[in-house]
Amino acid sequence: MSDAMDVLLAGRIGLLVRIQSHPGARLALLDALNDYCENLDQEPGTEAFMIALDPSDEDVIWLYEWFTDQEALDAHRASDAFADLMHRMPELVAVPPGVLPINPLRVRLAKQPLEQSL
């Protein structure tokens, strides 16, 4: 049997978010998102928050998030850390973020990436 994390996610709520920074502001936007990520322990219903770079556009960042349920998503949006992030966003983003609601079904992660830390 594999040591991979393999979880069914039925009932979870997910978001795929596309954020386009002002030209040259991607590093500042990444700093803001990483600062936000450091506070996710204050949101117990936020189960995953992934930041990814768009390889074809140096001004675009993608977020993948999933939450235990609607109540957790509402708590996420009502958190102080989220309010701080939203306060920083206007000077960093070129257009309003695109948000695509999704329903996560399953995640499988190999053990090795989980053992590596920042």
Region annotations inferred by a language model:
Residues 23, 56-58, 68-71:
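Short, charged/polar surface micro-motifs in flexible loops or helix N-caps
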Residues 28-38:
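A contiguous binding-surface segment within folded domains or other stable secondary-structure elements
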Residues 1-11, 51-59, 87-118:
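Glycine-rich beta-strand-turn "strand-cap" elements at beta-sheet edges
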Residues 37-61:
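Short, glycine- and small/hydrophobic-rich beta-strand elements in well-ordered beta-sheets
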Residues 20-29:
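Short, surface-exposed ligand-recognition loops at beta-strand->loop->(often short) alpha-helix junctions
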Residues 8, 39-47, 66-100:
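An amphipathic, aromatic/His-enriched active-site/gating alpha helix that lines ligand/cofactor pockets
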Residues 12-19:
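Active-site-flanking beta-strand signature of metal-NTP-handling nucleotidyl enzymes
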